[in-house]
Amino acid sequence: MALTIHGYRVSKTDIPNLTKLQTALTVRPYVPAVFVKPQFVPKYPVFKESEKYMYVPKHYGIQEYGQYGASTRDVPQTDAKYWEFAGAIRPAQQPVVDSFLKPEPHDGIISLQTGGGKTVCALYIASQLRVPTIVLVNSTFLRDQWVDRIKAFLPHARIGTVQGETMDIEDKDVIVGMLQTISMKELPPSTFTSIGLVVVDECHHIASEAFSQAIPKLT
C-alpha cells in the first residue's frame, strides 16, 4: 500500500472482494426527497483504478487496509522567507491549528463559527508547513477574498492562479485554484506533484460528482 497523488493505492491482488469495494465507493449524494426521489439521484464512483491497482480515498484505505507503507507525496519545504506570518493566532484559534500540527501534521476539517477565522487558521498552518499550497474555491468572490487574505497574512508569498486557461503555478507558494477548472479540465498527471497542502474552502461542495474529480489530481 502506498499514498500517491491519485489517493491510497492498493493492489487488486490484496483486495478479497473487489466488487464489494467498488460498491462501497460508488456513492449517491443526499438530495431531499421533496426535490428528487432518492432512486432517481444518480450514483458516481469516488475511486480510480488501473489494470493492477485501486486508488481509494486516503482515510478509507487506512481504515480498511491499514497505514500505507510508502508515500510519493512527500514534498520539500520552500524558503522560510516566503512564509512569514504577518499576524497572530487568537486564543480561540490556537487549539484549532494545534490539532492539525501536533504531534505531527495531518489533515482534517476546520470548523469555526462565521467570522471565527478559518481562512487565517489555514494560512497559519500553511506558514508552519512551508510547502507549496493550493486553495480550492468555487467562486470568483472567494478567489478574490483568498488573494486579499494571502497578501495580508503572508505578504511575501508568491501567489499563483488556476482558472480557465490560466495555469500560473510554477515557483508559487500559495495557488488559488477554481474547482470548476481543476475538476473538469484534462491535465497531465504531473501538474500538481509539487503541491504539499490542499485547502478546500466551502468543503461540503467537494463531494459532488463534478468537484470530487479534483481531489485525485491533487492529493
Regions found by a protein language model. Give the residues of each.
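SF2 helicase catalytic motif II
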Residues: 180-181, 188-219
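Interdomain "pre-motor" coupling segment immediately N-terminal to P-loop NTPase/helicase cores
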Residues: 24-75
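Hydrophobic positions in the central parallel beta-sheet of the AAA+
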Residues: 110, 135, 175-177, 190, ...
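Short Lys/Arg-enriched alpha/beta "domain-start" segment
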Residues: 1-33
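Conserved helix-turn-beta segment of the N-terminal RecA-like "Helicase ATP-binding" lobe
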Residues: 141-166
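Walker A/P-loop
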Residues: 103-129, 134-136
